């Protein structure tokens, strides 16, 4: 006697031998009806056949004669076999290997690339580092912020790696920077030299203010006498000269404000503590 497991295996073997790769055997999930099959009935009958053969006649002569034999033959009956539906996997699905009659494998056209898997018709599940309808596009982890590099991030096809400072080496997976033997290098200070540059700018503006003040004294000294003499000698109104003097005053005032602003912020500069 066979056990239940052996009977089940035998039943699957019968189904696999009897069916085709296109059709399944009963309606179920992702299985569609593709047509109705039917046709004439084939039946057997006894057919009479006359078979010639040689024999000897009187006088030892060879004679030919016939004998009747009967054999089983097949013929089409006028009747029609009962119609029955035919089933196949619905569009976008195909037979699952090892499971007769099951349509559990999705179809993606074009197929998924770079290690992606087809999870439903026309939709791929992409591995880490790839994106797109068929997993054809590399993900730039450096620009999207997915990478966690503390220093420089370098994108590669399907992944990325971190480039460390001098004296550091990348980790096994390339996503971190590890210090080599010895003291860790100090990262460059981007604010180095800012204090000295600000001081030089203050000195330069102060020198310009001094020059403009000297010019202003030269202009204002003869201003009153110039106005009186111009009236006595019938000269034109010296308003243009006065307007020029006021412009010089405005320039001096503007430069003084710039010097004050730099001096005020120079004291609060964080990099000053490193000097």
Curated annotation (Swiss-Prot):
Keyword terms, alphabetized: Angiogenesis, Calcium, Cell adhesion, Coiled coil, Developmental protein, Differentiation, Disulfide bond, EGF-like domain, Repeat, Secreted, Signal
Cystine connections: 32-90, 57-63, 89-103, 108-118, 112-124, 126-135, 142-153, 149-162
Keyword Ligase listed: no
Domain EMI stretches: 28-105
UniProt feature coiled coil, ranges: 196-220
Localisation: Secreted, Extracellular space
Chief subcellular location: secreted
Domain EGF-like: 104-136, 138-178
Region (Disordered): 173-193
Annotated GO MF terms: calcium ion binding; Notch binding
InterPro entries (alphabetical): Dev_Signal_Modulators (IPR050969), EGF-like_Ca-bd_dom (IPR001881), EGF-like_dom (IPR000742), EGF_Ca-bd_CS (IPR018097), EMI_domain (IPR011489), NOTCH1_EGF-like (IPR049883)
Signal peptide: 1-21
An individual GO BP term: blood vessel development
Motif (Cell attachment site): 131-133
Gene3D superfamilies, alphabetized: Laminin
Quaternary structure, from the entry: Interacts with ITGAV/ITGB3 in an RGD-dependent manner, increasing endothelial cell's motility.
Function: Regulates vascular tubulogenesis in vivo. Inhibits platelet-derived growth factor (PDGF)-BB-induced smooth muscle cell migration and promotes endothelial cell adhesion to the extracellular matrix and angiogenesis.
Name of the protein described by the UniProt record: Epidermal growth factor-like protein 7
